[in-house]
Curated annotation (Swiss-Prot):
Transmembrane portions of the chain: 5-25
Protein name: Na(+)-translocating NADH-quinone reductase subunit F
GO biological process terms, semicolon-separated: sodium ion transport
Lineage of producing organism: Bacteria, Pseudomonadati, Pseudomonadota, Gammaproteobacteria, Pasteurellales
Main function: NQR complex catalyzes the reduction of ubiquinone-1 to ubiquinol by two successive reactions, coupled with the transport of Na(+) ions from the cytoplasm to the periplasm. The first step is catalyzed by NqrF, which accepts electrons from NADH and reduces ubiquinone-1 to ubisemiquinone by a one-electron transfer pathway.
HAMAP family tied to this protein: NqrF
PROSITE patterns recorded: 2FE2S_FER_2, FAD_FR
2Fe-2S ferredoxin-type domain boundaries: 36-130
First-tier enzyme category under EC: translocase
Record key words, sorted: 2Fe-2S, Cell inner membrane, Cell membrane, FAD, Flavoprotein, Ion transport, Iron, Iron-sulfur, Membrane, Metal-binding, NAD, Sodium, Sodium transport, Translocase, Transmembrane, Transmembrane helix, Transport, Ubiquinone
Family matches, as PANTHER family: NA(+)-TRANSLOCATING NADH-QUINONE REDUCTASE SUBUNIT, NAD(P)H-FLAVIN REDUCTASE
SUPFAM superfamilies, alphabetized: 2Fe-2S ferredoxin-like, Ferredoxin reductase-like, C-terminal NADP-linked domain, Riboflavin synthase domain-like
Family: Belongs to the NqrF family.
Length: 411
């Protein structure tokens, strides 16, 4: 065989090998790399279907088309709120989802939208209320301290717009990359003692990505044109002083009147039941927000005659806020009473009211002698330790799960 023939055969063989490898790569790319447009059918309604380029996660794909699914953690897979039903497509459920979705739900197709890859056509089922969710660019009206570690952020909604929320609902607030220096916070002198004691002024919050977090509303539907939040600054725990501070709470605390803020909503499921049962509200810390929203809505908008009481736990007297508002509601409504318990009253407080943890105070001074505590509805929001203690106490009293309503935000 001549050299020219051997060379030709070698070139041909090499070409075949290259073509085969290219074919393999293209095949693999078609399977592994997202490309082209895909269609997501929603709720079996052709008018709700969306078409968009493949790639990314389902949560982001929906948001890009103006469909905002609740995600308090901003798509990190930790809050478990963005649950949707995937009827077709999306691949197998991931281990990261199984802490929020049980086996029965997984079998029925429930997934976390933030974990579902958008690689091909899909069919999903979304709650109808999601289609009422919108985005607004709001303006900061005020951002004042109500307690040592709690600010009341008041936002103006764009003129002519309305956020159609229900009492107990929440919104999501967004922030672009930023740097916040705690030394720049505007904090009244009366709250400086703890800030100086723990040298909280030293902290800096640096965020390199777009973030989203959820906050319960302190306002109620009749307060038109505004959204009010109670935001607790998330400083590092004493045992981990070098841990980074909370990203969104730091951002919110840095806001000043006139600043622009993007929110989306409304969301929520912490709504009052439409019954005549007695309502018992239990709150602590920034868990005040949904308590205020609910109680104001019941008494000011609905003019409810249901028997209701509010039990709020604070450390000391200067941590009590909205006191005049609740005092006035109590004076005007014979069906409503409210109580505060201080867990760490200061000598200068000259406090003569309840002391101790709020779950103990509620039990010893009311529920222990209540003729039917299991028939009441309990609405609570506060620090995790408080929530757990209240729930245990209610369970011991025979209260069923359906009458224990918990807001996981605001504590």
């Amino acid at each position: 065989m001549s050299d020219s023939v051997i060379l030709a055969l070698g070139i041909a063989a090499f070409t075949v090998i290259v073509l085969v490898l290219v074919a393999i790569i293209l095949f693999a790319k078609s399977k592994l790399v997202d490309s082209g447009d895909i269609t997501i059918d929603i709720n079996d309604d052709p008018e709700k279907a969306i078409t968009l380029p493949a790639g990314g996660k389902l949560l982001g794909a929906l948001a890009s088309k103006g469909i905002f699914v609740s995600s308090a953690c901003g798509g990190g897979g930790s809050c478990g709120q963005c649950i949707v039903k995937v009827k077709n497509g999306g691949g197998e459920i991931l281990p990261t989802e199984l802490s929020h979705i049980n086996k029965r739900e997984a079998k029925e197709g429930y997934r976390l939208a933030c974990q579902v890859n958008v690689k091909g056509n899909m069919e999903v089922e979304l709650p109808e209320e999601i289609f009422g969710v919108k985005k607004w660019e709001c303006t900061v009206i005020s951002n004042d301290n109500k307690a040592t570690f709690i600010k009341e952020l008041k936002l103006a909604i764009p003129e002519g717009e309305e956020v159609p929320f229900r009492a107990g609902g929440y919104i999501q607030i967004e922030a672009e990359p930023h740097v916040v220096n705690y030394k720049d916070f505007d904090i009244p002198e009366e709250y400086h003692e703890d800030w100086d004691k723990y040298d909280l002024w030293r902290y800096v919050s640096k965020v390199d990505e777009h973030i989203i977090r959820a906050y319960s509303m302190a306002s109620y539907p009749e307060e038109k044109g505004i959204i009010m939040l109670n935001v607790r600054i998330a400083t590092p725990p004493p045992r981990q002083p070098d841990a980074p501070p909370g990203q969104m709470s730091s951002y919110i605390w840095s806001l000043k009147a006139g600043d622009k803020v993007t929110i989306s909503g409304p969301f929520g499921e912490f709504f009052a039941k439409e019954t005549n049962a007695e309502m018992v509200f239990i709150g602590g810390g920034a868990g005040m927000a949904p308590m205020r929203s609910h109680i104001f809505d019941q008494l000011k908008r609905l003019h409810s005659k249901r028997k209701m009481s509010f039990w709020y736990g604070a450390r000391s007297k200067r941590e009590i806020f909205y006191q005049e508002d609740f005092d006035q509601l109590q004076a005007e409504n014979p069906n409503f009473v409210w109580h505060v318990a201080l867990s760490d009253a200061l000598p200068e407080d000259n406090w003569t009211g309840y002391t101790g943890f709020i779950h103990n105070v509620l039990y010893e001074n009311y529920l222990k002698n209540h003729e039917a505590p299991e028939d009441c509805e309990y609405y609570m929001c506060g620090p995790p330790v408080m929530n757990a203690a209240v729930i245990k106490m209610l369970k011991d009293l025979g209260v069923e799960d359906e009458n224990i309503l918990l807001d996981d935000f605001g504590g």
